A protein has these predicted regions:
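Conserved beta-propeller blade signature
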Residues: 66-69, 109-112, 119, 149-152, ...
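Sequence/structural signature of beta-propeller modules
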Residues: 1-53, 262-282
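A short beta-strand motif characteristic of beta-propeller blades
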Residues: 43-49, 87-95, 126-133, 165-172, ...
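Hydrophilic extracytoplasmic domains
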Residues: 226-282
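Structural motif
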Residues: 75-84, 116-122, 156-163, 195-202, ...
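N-terminal, post-signal-peptide region of Sec/Tat-exported proteins
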Residues: 50-80
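A generic tandem-repeat structural signature
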Residues: 84-169
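Repeated scaffold domains used in trafficking and secretory/extracellular systems
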Residues: 51-61, 95-107, 135-147, 175-186, ...
């Protein structure tokens, strides 16, 4: 088994060594006989309600709640070990049988996907409640930037838009064979298909993002964790790209300040993950 560290839209995954602006080389796919960790440290600080995320600044604020989805791989199959919350130096499990957390929440609460639907966690009161009345097995969940509407990815790889406080869902027919979903800050919907290639959903249907490597593997998609007004964040073979609503893309080049902040992030991440790693596995 291995630990898969996908932090802040995979900013902790190093870029190609041939790129003079790449991040310092570190291997975040390390051997582990305990568990996999995916999607750690989603931001629920409330700083992103009306603006894009401002680089790495403050992402490891001690009092801000971060989330880590933990799983163990048995017989080649990933099994959920639950969602953990990290706050004020402490880690605790908040939901079993879940691997989906809404990233970059604009309020003091996070939405979690579970085998029996959607839950909401208030980071101030530290209370978990069922959200709405849906009972789908949710393996992916994202929240719109400008509203409380959600998009969910179900176990059968179908995407729905969820409205009316979790009581109504509408299938997104344009998205097919979906593996992962993401929104940009303009709430455009992107997804990775069965071929590990990203698509954007438009009024004319789903469009394949152009300008990316063919037969890409080890892909990741999310809202941009750096200050970019338009487009989504895509990682492919350790290279970062910005993918746009018009189905184009361009490689992202990290500046010196981002590389310095990256090193700080690595140190903070190691501290948090060591605590999660010491949580008991049944």
């Amino acid at each position: 088994m291995r630990v898969l560290l996908v932090c802040l839209a995979s900013l902790l995954v190093c870029l190609k060594t041939a790129d003079s602006h790449s991040l310092p080389q570190k291997d975040y796919d390390t051997d582990s006989n305990k568990h996999d960790i995916t999607d750690p440290l989603n931001d629920t600080s409330g700083n992103n309600s009306s603006s894009v995320h401002d680089n790495f600044s403050g992402i490891f604020d001690y009092s801000t709640t971060r989330f880590i989805a933990r799983s163990v791989t048995r017989g080649g199959k990933k099994e959920s070990m639950g969602i953990y919350a990290y706050k004020n130096g402490k880690v605790k499990m908040i939901l079993e049988d879940s691997l989906a957390v809404s990233p970059w929440s604009s309020k003091s609460r996070a939405y979690l996907g579970n085998k029996d639907g959607i839950y909401v966690y208030d980071t101030e009161t530290e209370k978990l409640e069922k959200y709405g009345n849906l009972s789908d097995n949710v393996i992916g969940i994202v929240k719109e930037n400008r509203s409380d509407d959600l998009y969910i990815l179900t176990e059968d790889h179908v995407v729905y838009k969820v409205t009316e406080e979790g009581t109504k869902k509408v299938k997104i027919n344009e998205a097919e064979h979906v593996e992962k979903i993401a929104l940009d800050w303009d709430d455009n919907l992107y997804y990775i298909g069965a071929n590990d290639h990203p698509y954007v959903v438009t009024s004319d249907g789903a469009k394949k993002i152009e300008g990316l490597p063919v037969n890409s593997t080890r892909t990741f998609i999310s809202r941009p964790p750096i200050k970019i007004e338009h487009g989504a964040w895509f990682m492919c073979e350790k290279q970062a790209y910005i993918i746009y609503p018009n189905a184009t893309s361009e490689p992202y080049v990290f500046n010196d300040q981002e590389k310095l902040e990256y090193e700080k992030t690595v140190r903070a991440l190691k501290t948090i993950l060591s605590q999660v790693d010491n949580q008991p596995v049944e």
